[in-house]
């Protein structure tokens, strides 16, 4: 595919490759790294008391002066020790186990993790999903006053986050559904955190959120919406810490690069901006879309997938300052997500779902009319419009071929993405009334959460009064 060189995305970066660990199972994919980058395991566990907070500060001070090489070596040793301890606990009753066998288990585990992370091996979760039982259905665990516009899960699947058109940001427990609300600070505090008030009174005082993202280490929550700012929150304290300025339009989508503090934001001004949450700084902006940017997604590599109202889907290769452009022929893109580093899914306003390859300009497989309007959603009783069949959300269970899509037709559909045959196979339909504006799989594949509401995420093109505004969870039984 032709690579279109894009000026203005920013200067190329130069970085050093890690030479600390020569074990092939520990090495990451070769890539140019930015100045601001950190590792998956460099995190601080959330604290509930002041004493635990002080302990965390002491730990930070202890490693404050170590070099990058020392830090990577320490993290690698911690990872090896943790895996060895886990394997030893699993086989502690086996007296005949020797050191060579334990080493082989550690190497096998590291190899599997690296292959899954790079996308070379995927778990067969789609084949493991068992037939649904009568008790298996969506259950609303968190309620909002207005339509939910975004949902996300922490890396350990224990906590969830949701935002809605009512401006509330909720942090909730997956098992119990108990939620806590993030409190917006005063205008003076927001101004001290970098917020620039707009001339428009509506924009200035509107805290309506349309997108959110959670960092892999569970330290930062990013939200964005009508006020044209990207807001950064500390998950440990649930306090507002920074307001990133720079977008001239509504912030419509957010995502973190896996394993880093690098944050991507898409806006109605057509730009894709890059920030560093840990250092709370702006890095650069990527250009290319000629209209509003609607949805973005990213994995571990420095590549960002985006779709916009200009009927294009673009894959930005940030270090090389290049991008690949994929065009929709008959419809507008509504959402997108990565399947792996070389394949991705898109949802359109004509009700179709498409599977794309990085090597081809056209989709390799299309499911037409994926979300047809079912009988219970007739226009008389539920004010159903053509917007009900728009595919407003797609999600993939990371490291597997299990995917899901949502619209306003009354159900969430599960799919199996077959890379070898380049096909999408339908699996199950999960009834859920309302507009499904956001989806997220648990990393284990054991459940699926959906942000649902009476209205679509980015407008008021339809209204389903029978729907409930909130976050719904559906268990998935794997064999």
UniProtKB/Swiss-Prot annotation:
Gene Ontology CC annotation, any one: Cul4-RING E3 ubiquitin ligase complex
Region spans: Disordered: 1-73
Example GO molecular function: U3 snoRNA binding
Keyword NADP appears in the UniProt entry: no
Bias (Acidic residues) ranges: 39-51
RNA-binding in keyword set: yes
Observed effect of gene inactivation: Embryonic lethality.
Per-repeat ranges for WD: 143-182, 204-243, 246-285, 288-326, 328-366, 386-425, 431-471
Role according to the record: Component of a nucleolar small nuclear ribonucleoprotein particle (snoRNP) thought to participate in the processing and modification of pre-ribosomal RNA. Essential for embryogenesis. May function during late embryogenesis.
Family: Belongs to the WD repeat RRP9 family.
Name assigned to this protein: U3 snoRNP-associated protein-like EMB2271
Gene: EMB2271
